[in-house]
Amino acid sequence: MLDREGFRPNVGIVLLNQKNQVFWGKRIRTHSWQFPQGGIDRGETPEQAMIRELHEEVGLLREHIRIVARTRDWLRYEVPDRYIRRDARGFYKGQKQIWFLLQLVGHDWDLNLRATDHPEFDAWRWNDYWVPLDAVVEFKRGVYEIALTELARYLPRNELRNRFLRQGVRPHEQETTFDAVPGANFELPPGGSFEPNPQTSYGLDASGKPHET
């Protein structure tokens, strides 16, 4: 389902634990890490799609989370042509997203990456809310910054000081600097990166629905 401009309606999920650390998932059979996200099916509201995607990707139910906030408007990113399948080029442009900030009220053991027969992730970890955005795949970087910045107002005030980290600026009490790779505040497992899987392409499935492959 695409809008008139070629964007697929989508939801993004920022899931917090009780320490305000954020869930990151490793895409199955790749070294790419990202926030949970997924398309909105026809007839669904963004919240309904978020609850469905949350269960499909990380195994959580509505009772396991508290909805803290959501972005006010759609946030868009365009997918570069080299990641779009040839049969979708010319009319599929990218994703438009509503982002939700969620608080986990359950436990870590409620997370289940095998809740469905088509898992999206094969590993997960908690990390600080802010990460150096030069470590995020380039075409999603702007959306991540806008979403995290808009939703940060709903975090406890002691988390707001970390807003400097997204631009590599260190607060006075912080001695860490950030280069073009994840730094001390964001550790990836060996071999991990935010670069897209070279085999990933964006196109249409058998029903004509845009998807990542």
From Swiss-Prot:
Q: What class of enzyme is it?
A: hydrolase
The record's annotation in Gene3D superfamilies points to:
Nucleoside Triphosphate Pyrophosphohydrolase
Cofactor(s) the record lists: a divalent metal cation
| Motif residue range(s): Nudix box | 38-59
Which top-rank group of organisms is this from?
Bacteria
Q: Where does the record place the Nudix hydrolase domain?
A: 6-149
Question: What EC number(s) does the entry state?
Answer: 3.6.1.-
- Residue ranges for the region (Disordered) are 185-213
Q: Does the keyword Amino-acid biosynthesis apply?
A: no
Q: Which UniProt keywords apply?
A: Hydrolase
Q: In the record, what terms sit under GO molecular function?
A: pyrophosphatase activity
For this chain, the family text in UniProt reads: Belongs to the Nudix hydrolase family. RppH subfamily.
Q: What does this protein do?
A: Accelerates the degradation of transcripts by removing pyrophosphate from the 5'-end of triphosphorylated RNA, leading to a more labile monophosphorylated state that can stimulate subsequent ribonuclease cleavage.
Q: What is this protein called?
A: RNA pyrophosphohydrolase
Species this protein is from? Albidiferax ferrireducens (strain ATCC BAA-621 / DSM 15236 / T118)
